[in-house]
Amino acid sequence: MTRLPAIFLLSGILISACHFGDAPRTPANRKPAKAKEGRIPDTVKVGIYITSIHDIDFKEKQYSTNFWVWFKYKRKEFDFINNLEIPNAKTFSKSFTTSDTTNGRVYVLMKIQATMKDSWRIGNFPFDQQRMMMSFENSQYDINDLVFAIDSSGQQYDPRFTLNGWTIDSSRVMVTTRPYESSFGLDSLPSNHMDYSSFRVRLILTREAGGLFWKMFLGMYIAFLIAYVCFYIHADGFDSRFGLSVGALFAVIGNKYIVDSSLPESTSYTLVDALHGLTLFFIFAIISATAISLKLVKMGRTKLADRFDFITAQVFLLIYLVVNIYLIYQATQNN
């Protein structure tokens, strides 16, 4: 019996030792996780080969293009077949895709048909030069995970394809950072700002304007010449002179509407506006000169009226030609 208290005492000591050795962990004694070190983004080599550009539509501000694009990288989760984004494309589709994952790297090749949107520079139309831009991004990974590098081997476009009415002056590929001032609803982001690596291709095209210029402005110049001929109608034919001049005025206005219908809307003052405005001004000046001649005839000063018509005709024609040449020259030099 005397051993029982000793046994109970020993058991209590063992139980207490076990209880304190397995004490529950509280937030006070939990070790904090180590801070994440700065990530080094993976590099994706990208290249492009444009095979055609067609269906350039100035009114709808778009054009169509076919091209091959390829990506070479290590991380399979980048998945450019599903994550490729072309921000300035209205629509695009892949007519061919292939991928290779040998040697621990991923190679993706795609043939894409796209309808691209663009803002045309029409200030110097039809002596204009256009800069067509295409950009490519990964829709899932920002610049902290992925940066593009240019695969500069070979050319960026097929020199054999011809673009009707245009000449390709140059091409350039570049890598930039595109900022988005939004968190896209992700509360975990520290700010409403994200940066994505962007691969961009720029083609500079110059319009072959000779034939197009005369096609669009020949009616305007003929209308001016019809009004100009009024100076050589005898002073007695004022009805004919006024009729021809007013008819020419409306012909120029009609030609302006026809030309504008093929161009996108613009708030800037263009070469088309300048040439039509100049022609309208000179036709109005011809009508005003005709009115002065009529007044001189009614005053009985017919010879003076004839002399006034002759001098005014030469001055108007010279100024009109000089200003036209100047405006056209400026348009060809300002691209």
Language model regions located:
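Bacterial N-terminal signal peptides that target proteins for export
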Residues: M1-A6
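Channel- or pocket-lining gating/hinge segments that regulate access to a cavity or pore
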Residues: R200-F316
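Generic detector of bulky aromatic hydrophobic side chains
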Residues: S119-W120, W166, F217, Y232, ...
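Intrinsically disordered, low-complexity peripheral segments of secretory-pathway and membrane proteins
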Residues: A17-E77, S261-P264, S268-N335
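Bacterial N-terminal signal peptides
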Residues: I7-S16
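Soluble non-transmembrane domains of integral membrane proteins
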Residues: G21-I204
